Amino acid sequence: MKTVVFAYHDMGCLGIEALLAAGYEISAIFTHTDNPGEKAFYGSVARLAAERGIPVYAPDNVNHPLWVERIAQLSPEVIFSFYYRHLICDEILQLAPRGAFNLHGSLLPKYRGRAPLNWVLVNGETETGVTLHRMVKRADAGAIVAQLRVAIAPDDIAITLHHKLCHAARQLLEQTLPAIKHGNILEIAQRENEATCFGRRTPDDSFLEWHKSASVLHNMVRAVADPWPGAFSYVGNQKFTVWSSRVHPHASKAQPGSVISVAPLLIACGDGALEIVTGQAGDGITMQGSQLAQTLGLVQGSRLNSQPACAARRRTRVLILGVNGFIGNHLTERLLREDHYEVYGLDIGSDAISRFLNHPHFHFVEGDISIHSEWIEYHVKKCDVVLPLVAIATPIEYTRNPLRVFELDFEENLRIIRYCVKYRKRIIFPSTSEVYGMCSDKYFDEDHSNLIVGPVNKPRWIYSVSKQLLDRVIWAYGEKEGLQFTLFRPFNWMGPRLDNLNAARIGSSRAITQLILNLVEGSPIKLIDGGKQKRCFTDIRDGIEALYRIIENAGNRCDGEIINIGNPENEASIEELGEMLLASFEKHPLRHYFPPFAGFRVVESSSYYGKGYQDVEHRKPSIRNARRCLNWEPKIDMQETIDETLDFFLRTVDLTDKPS
């Protein structure tokens, strides 16, 4: 049976050997060039392919149409992937009539995504395994063909567990590959409600936070022990690596990070103490804990820190333009909850952020971005991260004031983008789900979906096209001038402080706010073109948590990425949204203050939005990038969001002149 193989690492080598032993004909192997910054302790797929006389390739982008065509010419009957590090596009997967299969280093559906070997140790698991599954468009989500469990011993570290998994993988492939060859396999669908997903790990993720328990820190040490980069901490500005450790049941009132003793080298943790058995100062040699203490100049009572002392002195400065808006005020709240951010904000009002005005790490100026250009340029230069959140983002304005939409959403934001390029500042830019336009894909994918809009005489697309062009400009600045950026695309975020009822009165609000106003005033809920258009509604708390993780940017995983932030499980039509909102309204304790429900009324979009409007039938995000880059999943059910949003707005209504 002819196959094409995508492979890397030890698992790639053993997968190739297993295929050859099972009588498969390998037409070509696709692998990666080795990263010079990565310690290559594993076998070389390229070398193995060369020794076996098999053509081998390492393209930067195997999903490029030219490579898809070359693979098609090989006419593979089946495709295998063994620890290949890039997602393989659906066009390639569809080339093999017998399907495509991937070997994954966990017991799926648990630990989908990157680095499952390390993550299971970080999380203190006692069992993992290997899974062979059918490949589908979503990473690690296809039906399971075979699994083998592997016990994790208390003394296992990453390399010993790696060897166990390799042994299990050989067994699994020896048992399963002949069955695939003869078409004799039983596939079991994964249980999506049990799925967990983890992102890529980088060396920077392995710092030891001493306020955590000793067992948690010990698991971190196990997860990244040699030949991985190692867990680390600091004495002042001196970095040191912990290669092996033990949990010590030492009851101490010492502050976390304090040295309890130097022989053995014992460090107080949030719970218990961690004994550093072996370690390394800077780029030096590995030594036992007591010698490491001497090398680092530690004595009883010394304090360790999780980051260099010089870095700990200054908070990250975040500039939020449009800080009083829906996203801006919720993001400010999330940032100020931590102690390492200084927030600078500009907006034309302050009603939503009044609760922060006396906060010592919040600095606000009331003003217009089109007027305060000098203030903005100065603060772009001063701050570390810039979020230009100012935009007109209500559909009725796209047809009512298209030029104003263009001037604010495009021209003013382009100026800010250029400031970020000039001063080499990181920009986190709010793209929009609107850029996908009338895309027909089931899931809108950041990297593959086409962006399709209507004709020029439909001005409702001016917002979408303005945002899309800014996305492309930012991307080009990143490619050509090194701009550090992330684009995020919110999908119908909802929650308290989304617009206000006064904005809804003039039609300049998002859907749920307009519907709430109809209930408050006793006017009919208008269903535009019947309200059958479907959207995926996302709780503001889920959205802000994802945005916060983009700002945190662990391991720089978000750099140069486009990230959809939405909840594909919360899909509903506007009509269904109205019905859910009505049911919540009827049960609300303040219901008796408001008029009777006036019913639903179907209206044409042209009579509501005006000439030049087009709607979109569905808008469902792929959140593959959010899972990969942020280790993020939305958690909050749509009904909970509706209840809380409704409650917030009803409690803003002046009830003094309402009948009780």
Curated annotation (Swiss-Prot):
GO terms for molecular function: carboxy-lyase activity; UDP-4-amino-4-deoxy-L-arabinose formyltransferase activity; UDP-glucuronate dehydrogenase activity. Keywords: Antibiotic resistance, Lipid A biosynthesis, Lipid biosynthesis, Lipid metabolism, Lipopolysaccharide biosynthesis, Multifunctional enzyme, NAD, Oxidoreductase, Transferase. NAD(+) binds at D347, D368, I369. Coiled coil: none annotated. GO terms for biological process: lipid A biosynthetic process; lipopolysaccharide biosynthetic process; response to antibiotic. The record marks D140 as: Raises pKa of active site His. Residues 1-304 are annotated as: Formyltransferase ArnAFT. Residues 314-660 are annotated as: Dehydrogenase ArnADH. UDP-alpha-D-glucuronate binds at residues 393, 398, 432-433, 460, 492, 526-535, 613. It comes from the Bacteria. Pathway: Nucleotide-sugar biosynthesis; UDP-4-deoxy-4-formamido-beta-L-arabinose biosynthesis; UDP-4-deoxy-4-formamido-beta-L-arabinose from UDP-alpha-D-glucuronate: step 1/3; Nucleotide-sugar biosynthesis; UDP-4-deoxy-4-formamido-beta-L-arabinose biosynthesis; UDP-4-deoxy-4-formamido-beta-L-arabinose from UDP-alpha-D-glucuronate: step 3/3; Bacterial outer membrane biogenesis; lipopolysaccharide biosynthesis. Disulfide bonds: none annotated. Bifunctional enzyme that catalyzes the oxidative decarboxylation of UDP-glucuronic acid (UDP-GlcUA) to UDP-4-keto-arabinose (UDP-Ara4O) and the addition of a formyl group to UDP-4-amino-4-deoxy-L-arabinose (UDP-L-Ara4N) to form UDP-L-4-formamido-arabinose (UDP-L-Ara4FN). The modified arabinose is attached to lipid A and is required for resistance to polymyxin and cationic antimicrobial peptides. This is Bifunctional polymyxin resistance protein ArnA.
